[in-house]
Amino acid sequence: MEPLKLLPAFQDYIWGGTRLRDEYGKPCDLERIAESWELSCHPAGESVIMNSVYKGQTLKSYLEQDWAARVGEGAARLSAFPVMVKLIDARQDLSVQVHPDDRYARVHEKGENGKTECWYVMDCDEGAALALGFNRELTKDEFRRAIKQGTVLDWMQLVPVKKGDVFFIEAGTLHAIGAGILIAEIQQSSNLTYRVYDYDRVGADGKPRELHIEKAVDVTKTWPAPPRRNIPLTDYQGYSVALLADCPYFTVTELHITEGAAFPASGGRSYTHLLCTDGEAALVYDNGVAMPVVKGDSLLLPANFGAYSLRGKHCTFLCTQTLPR
């Protein structure tokens, strides 16, 4: 069994740039690449396997052929793959938006998932910032009025960002990624977004992009959001590690490899998704077989994969799993 290299699905939203192609080698001919969906079984864009005997299969098809063995105990209890991992290149400001939780989505959105997410800032322009939650508690009526007056950003916390910052965005948290930020986003497998402000932009059809005011008012937590997470790395011989997020949908770990690190088989507990965010390395498995990995590569190790190691000098990975609870 070999690690599976994944080809992402691409989205060309109007605010996207070209960094994912220019700096991360993403093979896409779109004029702009706003998002690459690196790990996705979502019908709006599925990852495709690039190597092995499964080359050309969608990730969803591959997992469903042996569901429990490939997704692991943590996700096997679910009827669909619970996680999406994406890269976001915000060349322009994203809309001010919010995502519902599972309960609201399943009632009002035909059984769709809600969306809790984790952001890892891979890079950013000097002075870049994002808007996150409110700067004071508002009533629902105050929030609705601010939306209709186009002043909602005046009531939000503006947070300057730097490379390596981490944010955990629970469903119901109003937010907006600012221009000049490159983010790795680990989220529930959902494409539900309720926009409340979009800078009066028009979409590809020449019409203003739709706002979703009443649904947003229903689901938004109208109080200040928790700040960024400053999570120190814990050093071990040859590598460092930090737990970035841990929730029922996903567990995210940052791995910084300085020489090498060995990892045991998961024992069927969870798949492992590895996203190389910086540097280059070798993934060594099956008694010495080495697979080269470079910045931007996205790899899936099914839950029945064996022990492996990562070897390299100053390379960084985000490791995503869905662990048993």
Model-predicted segments: where are they?
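Transition-metal
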Residues: M1-L138, D198-R228, V252, P324-R325
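Ligand-binding loop in jelly-roll beta-barrel domains
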Residues: A80, I88-D93, C124-G127, T173-L192, ...
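His/acidic/aromatic-lined binding-pocket segments of jelly-roll/cupin-type domains
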Residues: V85, L94, G111, E117-Y120, ...
